[in-house]
UniProtKB/Swiss-Prot annotation:
Domain Helicase ATP-binding: 194-406
Domain notes: The Q motif is unique to and characteristic of the DEAD box family of RNA helicases and controls ATP binding and hydrolysis.
Function: ATP-binding RNA helicase involved in mitochondrial RNA metabolism. Required for maintenance of mitochondrial DNA.
Organism taxonomic ancestry: Eukaryota, Fungi, Dikarya, Ascomycota, Pezizomycotina
InterPro entries listed in its UniProt record: DEAD/DEAH_box_helicase_dom, Helicase_ATP-bd, Helicase_C-like, P-loop_NTPase
Gene: mrh4
Protein's recorded name: ATP-dependent RNA helicase mrh4, mitochondrial
Motif Q motif: where in chain: 141-174
Amino acid sequence: MNRLGRLPLPLPPSVCLFCRFRATASLPSSLQATRSMATARLRRRVARMTLSPDVAKPSVVKKTRGDKERFGPFAGMNQTEARIRETPRARSRAAQKRSGEPEEDSQKESPLYKALKMQTALTPIPYGRRAAIKAKIADITSFDQFQLLPVVRNSISSQALPGLVDVTPTPIQRLAIPRLLEEPKTEKKPTKADDDEPRYDQYLLAAETGSGKTLAYLLPVVDAVKREEARDKELEKKEQEEKAREREERLKNRAFDIEPEIPPLSNAGRPRAIILVPTSELVAQVGVKVKALSHTVKYRSGMISSNFTPRRIKNTLFHPDGIDILVATPHLLASIAKTEPYVLSRVSHLVLDEADSLLDRSFAPTTTEIISKAAPSLRKLILCSATIPRSLDNLLRKRYPDIKRLTTPNLHAIPRRVQLGVVDIEKDPYRGNRSLACADVIWSIGKAGDAESEGPYASYVAPKTKKILVFVNEREEADEVAQFLRSKGIDAQSLSRDSDARKQEEILAEFTEAPPPPSPDEILLAQKKRRYEDAIPFEMPEKANQGSSRRLANTKVLVTTDLASRGIDTLAVKTVILYHVPHTTIDFIHRLGRLGRMGKRGRGVVLVGKKDRKDVVKEVREGMFRGQALI
């Protein structure tokens, strides 16, 4: 402290500022780094003293045009270079539809039968195989090219196909008859490994509906029966000669000690060939064809079913003269075989007509039992069907791996001469009333004229009656639909399992038998009747009243189930109405197969409702138009 008692003021440093700055710069680098890190935030330069990196960019940002705005009405103006794309841009589906061009990804879309593939029921057959079969049978044009007996060949035009001018074999007949006429191979001695394998030849005849499958297997069977009959007569003659020679020797050696002769086994109740069919209606139809050939070929045939009385069945099967060909149902034949085991002891040919039905769940045990009992004497097993479901194909591959498959090129296809129309019952005026839509379609068909000419006798006879089949899915609805149609003035009848057997035969006869051409007496009678009606004037008001009544004339309708969809030869039917959409393509084939038989045209109509599979109906219709096989 100084004299005034205060602290002395600090003296100014003797070192100048420049020297002090140099001393600070000469500090160690470690101390300097520590100091710079501590004061880094304080030493950051302010924004106004830093240049902006966007100085070179313009203040107004130029908008880039998108792909949609790049091309416009003025896009090509003031351009210095051509903007050509290396790869053109793909057009939208809407633009392709407007221009009518096919879409680029049409091949990636689902092909035909997308809906049917989801419920595939039939076994597919490659089209290469179909083409090979078609080329193979192209050279066969006449029944004379088959190695048939002369008496059998001459009976084809007179008994099997009467009334036809040009008698030519169908594709299935060209395939099946030569193969079925082949003699079976020489039997080799069975071994232990071959005990379970069948020792007879197996054949599968698969062809479209109405293609003549019945005649394809019937002619070879009749030919084989006649050949066996001739061989049996020769053997019987030799046996009688040997027995006579032995009898003479016994008489010489032992005149008073003669052994009693064993009587030969009777042929009563022992058919040579059996044809199995699933229904009694098919028994009657096939039995008539078998009987027709017997008039000229001379063999004994018979048919038995549940429609016949027990006395008639016994007289037919156990006739003293024997029986050669028998047509029966599996359950009836199996029940007879339990009490009469010799019924199947002489069977050399066994035919399963409609094999897909005879080998399904309901018939398979009975049919298999009959085949196993007839196996010791069986030489040929023939399976015949218009459809090959997957279940049948798997069964045949497992049980009969060596079966010979004879399939036609048009298997599983509905003929193109059959047209299919679709009626939407949800639209006006039906509004979901399926029965009303069915009645309206029938009235339209009945009132329309017949497209085909009725022949040169059309002006002499009465108008031709139109026959229409209506298929329903449930048997209970057959009577209901028929009753509704009758209330609308339509001559309709129902046919189902609940119908009387005698009534079934009468009804089916009207729809299966084509009317023959009128005789000269019938033409004269029709002319007299017409002159008589025209000469009485007071009958004209009655005719007018008849015409004004709500009755559909010259039209008959049969409402039925699948009972009449398999094998029934409905030559007189030109129209089929599917009251319900069938469950599978198999039902489509069999129901529409009642049309287009023997080369005739037909028309099918399906009623489609709100809950029906319209996509399935559409694909079936497209497949029919293209002539392709269904799946």
